[in-house]
């Protein structure tokens, strides 16, 4: 079984969401580097990332950026054809920063961090994965198929520009030419299985790889995709 590992550290971790909005989690406040990383993503996969909506998450930084730095980041991302639409992580400082930048602060992130500051709630159990959903026909370009709280099995092709999403695993018995996202609610144990692998994008629990990141020797092969130590792994099943 061949196994491909392409690990590298980035200043910003981009996670793909369920509704076409990505979250850019800022790990290192290096504005030129962050802008260059996003510009590289747009260059490698313009159909996926050009003018994509992005939520900025400064929650991993010890301190939020000052207004000048944050504005330079927002302006630089826009120049790179990436569109910041909101800010995550709702501390009072971030709330003020969002007002100064004219970007909304997402209420769900505000509530999450305010609860953490008061008292950490008991961990919530992951909803059980129910009986899977089966798709018999081709998923065509522009279509999106979502299997909530269950696995998704596709007995046909996922066309280029199509998107299949599941909270559980994804099994594709035809060709995958579009995008496949398993573990959509954050379950990193989920996997993608595909008989003919030619994907535009694959993601598990928000971590992703695009076509240019996938070795050519795996294209057209039967593969499985999983997450290990927050890195996407791809292995041939032949």
UniProtKB/Swiss-Prot annotation:
It comes from Xylella fastidiosa (strain M12). GO terms for biological process: cell morphogenesis; division septum assembly; regulation of cell division; regulation of cell septum assembly. The gene is minC. The lineage of its organism: Bacteria, Pseudomonadati, Pseudomonadota, Gammaproteobacteria, Lysobacterales. Gene3D superfamilies: 2.160.20.70, 3.30.70.260. Belongs to the MinC family. Keywords: Cell cycle, Cell division, Septation. This is Probable septum site-determining protein MinC. Cell division inhibitor that blocks the formation of polar Z ring septums. Rapidly oscillates between the poles of the cell to destabilize FtsZ filaments that have formed before they mature into polar Z rings. Prevents FtsZ polymerization. The keyword Cell division applies.
